[in-house]
Amino acid sequence: MNDENIFLTEQEAFQQLTLSQIVTKDHRAAGVFERYNLDFCCKGNKSFNDACKEKGLNAEEIISELQNSNLISNENAIRFNEWELDFLVNYIINNHHQYVKNSIPVISAHAEKVAQVHGKHHPETIEINKIFSIVYKDLKQHLMKEEEILFPYIKYIVKVKNNRSKPERPYFGSIKNPINMMESEHTSAGDNLFNIRKLTNNYSLPADACTTYSTYYKELKEFEEDLHKHVYLENSILFPKAIKVEEKIFQEFED
């Protein structure tokens, strides 16, 4: 299969690819999948065909949209899958982690304000505030675990691989253990934000929405979209490749 023209291959073969595989080939597919609420991160292991069937979507219509998006020059497409893992780690921290740290206190303040002012007539805002407070608390701990435990270890095994030095086993045994925990937490965060999207009816504003209300829903939508990209980079690229690197460096010294 030609990686450069993934959306121009036979439709039958294309539909068997998972959502994650498609986005890995060309990250611009993420924007199309977002519009159709196709989860390419936490549940990205579903085939394109199965995902469309589950949601009652017209697969051919989406493929056509993907083909049109691929007509744009590929020159500036970001090839995350080709990056060194330590560089990808820094990218995730500097872009997605920093975005979460900056935006989540602001959104939380708006969530509380909108729930207080509009909760009587729009009780869903009270529930959204409760859910987002859980997201806030969980992600704060999640980012800390990645930045203080998992990511430094990934940088360590990359350094060992490049220097061909003898690796030392981490206290957590295998990288698969913290990765399994991170993936579980990704799923939990994704589920919470999905429930928020349902409660907001896909971020649809009521007629009496004030400026803060409008800003708040835009922030929630942007936050969910960023989380999808963030989780995709980790679950579909960083983690699988890190597992392979760890297996390789220990195998070389055990053989």
Describe these PLM feature segments.
Residues 1-255:
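Small-residue-biased structural context
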